[in-house]
Amino acid sequence: VFLKSGKAIPADMVLLSIGVRPATALAQQAGLKLGEMGGIWVDEHLETSEKDIYAVGDAIEYPHPLTGKPWLNYLANPANRQGRIVADNMVFGNTVSYEGAIGTSIAKVFDMTVASTGLAAKRLKQWGMEYQSSVTHSASHAGYYPDAMPMSIKITFDKKTGRLYGGQIVGYDGVDKRIDELALVIKHEGTIYDLMKVEQAYAPPFSSAKDPVALAGYVAEDIITGKTNPVYWRELRDIEMENKFLLDVRTPDEFSLGSLPGAVNIPLDELRDRLAELPKDKMIYTFCAVGLRGYLAYRILTQHGFDKVRNLSGGLKTYRAATAPIIIREENGNEIDESPIQKETASQTSQPN
C-alpha cells in the first residue's frame, strides 16, 4: 500500500471500506426519476415516477425514517421486505406502504462481532442534528459465570427528548441480540428511557441482571437529567494541560500500570477524605477504567460544592483505544509512527463524538 507521503506499507490483507453507488443506468434509459443521492426515486408504495413500474433493493432512494432525508440502504433484509410489498401492491393496487429502513448491519471481523443501527455520530454531524452520545463497557453475561466476554456500546440520542438515534456495538458474544434490541426501539421512535424498560430473558450464562442495553439507557438518562456531565476523548485530548486537572480514581495498583499524562491518583474510597487536595478554580476531569467510578467521583465532588467537574465518557479504556499510536513496521525493520494521520482526521470536527 502506497501512501500519499510516499511511504509503502507491506500488508497481507487490505480492507476497502469505500462504499458503493447505485447502478441506475437501466432506470435512466427508461426515463425514470432519480433522487438527490443518485438512487431511483420511489413513493411510499415503491412505485417509480412511471406508473406501474416499481423498484426495490440497493438502487432505490427512500426517506430515512428518523429524518425524512433521502437515504440509500444497501441491505438484504429491507430489500426482501420491499419485494413482498411490491408483490402485494402490483396485485392488489398499492395497498401496502413501505416505512423505510434505519440501516441495521452486523459483521464478523475475525473473532470479533461489530454491529450498527440507526444514525451514528458522524452522520448526525453531517446532517447538522444536535445529539448527545454515551459509551459503556459491559460483559456479555454475568461476570461471575465463566467465559463472559467484553462488549462496548455507543448510542446517540436527542439531548432533550432522549429519542434514540443510533447504536454501535463491538464485542464477541451476544452482540447480535443487543443490536436487534436497539434497532427495535429506534424503529418504533423509542427513547433511551425505553432501553431502561426492555425486558430481556435473564440467566447468568446469557446476560446480566442489568443488561448492557439497559446499562446504556441508564447512563444516557444520567446525562440528560444532569446527574453527570460527560467529557469525550476528543475534547479531553485537545485541552491544554494547564487548563485541566486529571483525577484518576482507580486503585493505586491500577494507577501504577499507567494513566493519562499528568493525572493525579486519589482512589475513590479515599476521595471524601482528600477533597482539600483538589482545585476549585480549574476544571476537574474524573476518570476510571470504564466510567462507573469516575461517575461516582463526579457525584461526590458536585455534592461537595465543586462546580467545575466532568467525567470521561467510557473511561480510560475508551481514551486509550481511541488515541493509541499507529506504528507501522516496514520490511526493513524500521518503525514509522503514523499517529498524526489519526489526530488530523479526528480533529476535523469539534463536536463531541
Please report, for each region that a protein language model flagged, where it lies by residue:
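Short, glycine/acidic-enriched loop or turn micro-motifs at the edges of active sites
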Residues: 20, 61, 161, 251, ...
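Generic hydrophobic alpha-helical segments
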Residues: 155, 182-183, 236, 284
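Short, well-ordered alpha-helices that flank and scaffold nucleotide-derived cofactor binding pockets
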Residues: 88, 92, 184, 299-303
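FAD-site-proximal beta/loop scaffold in flavoenzymes
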Residues: 2, 7-88, 185
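Active-site flanking residues adjacent to catalytic metal/cofactor-binding acidic residues
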Residues: 57, 247-249
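A short, polar/charged loop-to-alpha-helix boundary motif
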Residues: 173-191
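Mid-to-C-terminal Rossmann-like scaffold of FAD/NAD(P)H-dependent oxidoreductases
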Residues: 59-173, 204, 208, 212-238, ...
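Rhodanese-like catalytic fold shared by cysteine-dependent sulfurtransferases
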Residues: 193-204, 208-245, 252-285, 289-353
